[in-house]
Amino acid sequence: MQNQIDMVKDEAEVAASISAIKGEEWGNCSSVEDQPSFQEEEAAKVPYVGDKEPLSSLAAEYQSGSPILLEKIKILDSQYIGIRRTRGDGNCFFRSFMFSYLEHILESQDRAEVDRIKVNVEKCRKTLQNLGYTDFTFEDFFALFLEQLDDILQGTEESISYDELVNRSRDQSVSDYIVMFFRFVTAGDIRTRADFFEPFITGLSNATVDQFCKSSVEPMGEESDHIHITALSDALGVAIRVVYLDRSSCDSGGVTVNHHDFVPVGITNEKDEEASAPFITLLYRPGHYDILYPKPSCKVSDNVGK
């Protein structure tokens, strides 16, 4: 019971943090009405998954902006080796998670992790069936994700290279299908644990759990927040670190970069928590997620507040 209470407190804190960030004014738009078209134009310039870039490219965006943001980017630059941008089309969280996870498996060749997540994928399939989803509505999405898992493991005729992984992630027919896989998995977990998620959903949108899943989870192009991240992390058993880039400062006036680790439910002791340390790190700016690459020798927790 205490663990559940702690989880609720953590989720409430994250929800408040994200809401505060979303309330900030960003960019150089002259009015709120200008922002949607501006964002669409900017999004179209970025592929679904971009190239890996140095953090200096992020700093260049804010040279004439907030000194606090520039200071925070300096902190990020000391902790992270690069950033990979994703298209800001409402699917950026899922695309970032997709590429970061598959990239990790391709580089690590962690067959035990592939075996583990396949078990969770099968549980997610049964969850959807038990909820009344018909197989034809989601089966193709599940099959394509499992195919990618098999193809990134080396040693078979179907094995793919790193460049091919990038190409597939930029291929709409592949990328969108995997995003839909994640959306179904997320919706299934939210519906199954409706009692847990309901307070956060009603607090954000005044919608029921069913309405929220139908309008804000399952459709392509709908943005993700802490509810989606928690559900996907728990369903697949994959920890996710989200680093927040905002204008906030410490009570003392200093500058820190806050992050939150979404640790899958069921992690109850320090040994398990250490074993499940996030290998996926995402950067959150208002309404958008990109991928961050930690420097191998850096302990992020030393200088980045949790």
UniProtKB/Swiss-Prot annotation:
According to its UniProt entry, this protein's organism is Arabidopsis thaliana (Mouse-ear cress)
Q: Please identify the protein, giving its name as recorded.
A: OVARIAN TUMOR DOMAIN-containing deubiquitinating enzyme 1
Could you say which EC number(s) this protein's record lists? 3.4.19.12
Listed Gene3D superfamilies: Peptidase C65 Otubain, subdomain 1, Peptidase C65 Otubain, subdomain 2
The yes or no answer to whether the keyword Hydrolase is present is: yes
For the biological process aspect of GO, one term held by this record is: proteolysis
Q: Where is the OTU domain?
A: 81-295
Catalytic activity, as annotated: Thiol-dependent hydrolysis of ester, thioester, amide, peptide and isopeptide bonds formed by the C-terminal Gly of ubiquitin (a 76-residue protein attached to proteins as an intracellular targeting signal)
